[in-house]
Amino acid sequence: MSSTLSENQAPETGTARVKRGMAEQLKGGVIMDVVTPEQAKIAEDAGAVAVMALERVPADIRKDGGVARMSDPDMIEGIIGAVSIPVMAKSRIGHFVEAQVLQSLGVDYIDESEVLTPADEVNHSDKFAFTTPFVCGATNLGEALRRIAEGAAMIRSKGEAGTGNVVEAVRHLRQIKNEIARLRGYDNNELYAAAKELRAPYELVKEVSELGRLPVVLFSAGGVATPADAALMRQLGAEGVFVGSGIFKSGDPAKRAAAIVKATTFYDDPKIIADASRNLGEAMVGINCDTLPETERYANRGW
């Protein structure tokens, strides 16, 4: 699909059911950030269900500063050509033209990501205008439901990307799960009040109350660096994990990647997790999230 739409050409769109179904296929797996075709192959060989193609992992984006934008199309296409598993790529929040470009390149999923510098401080992209399913981050249930109302087919609890510190991932996933549990058993009057409090459509709030979960897949992200971290997020209710800097900023990326996949699959078996954690080399150097100023907290981006 061309990223430039003529006045008489309606954008190609896909149904929410189809896009959500595509995301369902990733449940139980690990999605890994990669910056080269070689890294993408390592991720695929390790058992990743998808890769995220980007020029810099979050740890490097955090270190380098400046404006972080969509990755170069040649780099993305190189990764698409290197692997048989799905390829995701990031667009800036509200930058629907970057999303159009990514769709034209043939990526399998678009991540409207707070890790990149937001392009719009008021609006997120209209995700119903695309055939390609979108992934979006959330720190709480209201944020998750607002993204779903815009057409997101997958939610990831944000965590704090590029820190190697799982504490914010735990906080955000627990927040979402606790708020979902709170809605169980609410009557209509209480659901209307909850929708107002969450700043989310009543119909979605009611659906979550009835299902006892989000109507889309919920993964966890931000700070997962070890097999135990991945298993922790799964035991807390994540249906899969994103791993960014934690693999290719470690001492032995191939071994760590395979270990995190194994721990994500067998997340409720401590013996397997222990075996997967042996002799992995050095983990990435972590950051204490308490030391991050508000302006450097990626999770605060989005509304």
From Swiss-Prot:
CDD domains in the record: pdxS
Binding-site residues for D-glyceraldehyde 3-phosphate, renumbered to this chain: R174
MF GO annotations: amine-lyase activity; pyridoxal 5'-phosphate synthase (glutamine hydrolysing) activity
The reaction(s) this protein catalyses: aldehydo-D-ribose 5-phosphate + D-glyceraldehyde 3-phosphate + L-glutamine = pyridoxal 5'-phosphate + L-glutamate + phosphate + 3 H2O + H(+)
Domain of life: Bacteria
Catalytic site: K90 (schiff-base intermediate with d-ribose 5-phosphate)
The protein's Enzyme Commission number: 4.3.3.6
InterPro entries: Aldolase_TIM (IPR013785), PdxS/SNZ (IPR001852), PdxS/SNZ_N (IPR033755), RibuloseP-bd_barrel (IPR011060)
Positions bound to D-ribose 5-phosphate: D33, G162, G223, G244, S245
Pathway participation: Cofactor biosynthesis; pyridoxal 5'-phosphate biosynthesis
Enzyme class, spelled out: lyase
Keywords: Lyase, Pyridoxal phosphate, Schiff base
UniProt record, GO biological process: amino acid metabolic process; pyridoxal phosphate biosynthetic process; pyridoxine biosynthetic process
Known function: Catalyzes the formation of pyridoxal 5'-phosphate from ribose 5-phosphate (RBP), glyceraldehyde 3-phosphate (G3P) and ammonia. The ammonia is provided by the PdxT subunit. Can also use ribulose 5-phosphate and dihydroxyacetone phosphate as substrates, resulting from enzyme-catalyzed isomerization of RBP and G3P, respectively.
Quaternary structure annotation from Swiss-Prot or TrEMBL: In the presence of PdxT, forms a dodecamer of heterodimers.
Family stated for the protein in its record: Belongs to the PdxS/SNZ family.
Protein's recorded name: Pyridoxal 5'-phosphate synthase subunit PdxS
Gene: pdxS
